[in-house]
UniProtKB/Swiss-Prot annotation:
Protein source organism: Hapsidospora chrysogena (Acremonium chrysogenum)
Signal peptide location: none
Ranges of Low complexity composition bias in the record: 20-29
A biological-process GO annotation: conidium formation
InterPro entries: Znf_C2H2_sf (IPR036236), Znf_C2H2_type (IPR013087)
Statement: the UniProt record of this protein carries the keyword Glycoprotein: no
Disulfide bonds: none
GO molecular function: DNA-binding transcription factor activity, RNA polymerase II-specific; RNA polymerase II cis-regulatory region sequence-specific DNA binding; zinc ion binding
Phenotype of gene-disrupted mutants: Abolishes conidiation.
Protein name, per record: C2H2 type master regulator of conidiophore development brlA
Induction entry: Expression is positively regulated by stuA through direct binding of stuA to the abaA promoter region.
Length: 376
């Protein structure tokens, strides 16, 4: 089981038959996998400058449950008792581990192992044990494939009580938007799960999908294979549909308010004041809202008041003001007058034009441009 090889004329004895036991608790599903060991050098390391380097590698076993007994190994005539080293982990990895510096660097992808808190999962053992290899500066030892074998059977109720809310891979929003490209190890051949572990994992996943509404949402999209781009397009379509319905509702409300405003209410108050000022001349039924309008009516039609003015073109004498007479006379000089009650008289045109030319007019107001010129 031991081979000798030389590397830079040094001797290194590395008994690597070690059994490591640790327990896990699913407190956080996304913290980096950083084990805290109580020992810095759990195995014995000896150097010999004259001999050859021997590397004893039997089977590397990584146990998640403590072994029942400690076993002793014999190496080069010395008895080395390997005690199981207890290591406590805050959480199991759900994110890829960092690469290990050295000849054999293994990159681990996402493996969701949050099945139960404070329960042992199983034993991860190499599926094909590797023997001794001759190590030289040009060569490196490659990783081997592993296999998970559960050591304790868990019931469905225990899994449901002790599981984490984001233990299911498909329920996690990080895993939903960032699906791992490869669920196997970087250079490993296979990842073989036991039939019992697969049954418990499916039961746990189904239980969480029924309990969590968000889990149902992510589970639905993860099962249908929806990509982030398709989900983004779907969200934009839903937003556009909501905006369209909102605008339609606003337009309907505006139309309804206009219809209500157009219909007169039965109990509306009449704000228009009634014509209370009535003419008292016999046979005249005129009524006015304001008293001054009634006074003007009496002066015009009934001859009340002094300063009566008459038109020389038509003979009307119902004008008690000079400006009213002048406006009436101008209407006789306009052939296309809008007032059909005033007749067009051609003889009035030159007279009105002469009065317009001889009338003293006020100086037109200066424009702003002219004022600026004077200021400068």
């Amino acid at each position: 089981m031991e081979d000798g090889f030389g590397m830079y004329s040094h001797s290194m004895s590395c008994p690597s038959t070690a059994s490591t036991s640790f327990s896990s608790a699913s407190s956080s599903a996304y913290d980096p996998f950083t084990p805290s060991s109580r020992r810095s050098t759990p195995n014995e390391l000896s150097l010999d400058l004259d001999g050859s380097c021997s590397y004893a590698a039997h089977q590397h076993s990584l146990e998640l449950t403590p072994p029942t007994t400690s076993m002793a190994k014999y190496f080069m005539g010395q008895t080395i008792k390997q005690e199981p080293e207890q290591m406590s982990f805050g959480s199991l990895p759900t994110t890829p581990m960092k690469k290990v510096d050295g000849g054999f660097a293994a990159e681990y992808d996402l493996i969701d192992m949050n099945m139960a808190s404070h329960h042992s999962m199983g034993t991860i053992t190499p599926s094909n044990s590797f023997g001794l290899h001759t190590i030289s500066p040009e060569t490196a030892m490659g990783p081997t494939s592993y296999m998970m074998t559960p050591t304790q059977s868990l019931s469905g109720s225990e899994i449901a009580e002790s599981s984490s809310s984001w233990s299911v891979t498909n329920e996690s929003p990080i895993n939903f938007f960032q699906q791992p490209k490869d669920l196997s190890f970087h250079d490993m051949d296979s990842l073989d799960l036991d039939e019992r572990h697969h049954h418990h994992h499916n039961h746990h996943q189904h239980h969480h999908a029924q309990q969590s509404p968000m889990g149902q949402h992510f589970q639905l999209h993860s099962n249908t294979g929806a990509s982030p781009n398709s989900m983004r397009v779907q969200r934009k379509m839903m937003l556009h549909e909501a905006q369209r319905k909102t605008s339609e509702l606003q337009r309907a409300q505006i139309r309804e308010s206009r219809k209500r405003a157009g219909k007169p209410e039965s109990g509306a108050v009449d704000v228009v004041r009634r014509a209370m000022c009535k003419c008292d001349y016999p046979g005249c039924n005129k009524a006015f809202r304001r008293n001054e309008h009634l006074k003007r009516h009496k002066q015009t039609f009934h001859g009340e008041g002094p300063n009566r003015f008459s038109c020389e073109f038509c003979g009307k004498d119902q004008f008690n003001r000079q400006d009213n007479l002048n406006n009436h006379r101008k209407l006789h000089a306009r052939p296309n007058s809008r007032n059909r009650g005033v007749e067009f008289i051609p003889e009035a045109v030159p007279i009105i034009e002469h009065e317009e030319r001889s009338r003293k007019r006020r100086a037109p107001p200066k424009s702003k441009a002219e004022k600026r010129d004077y200021d400068f």
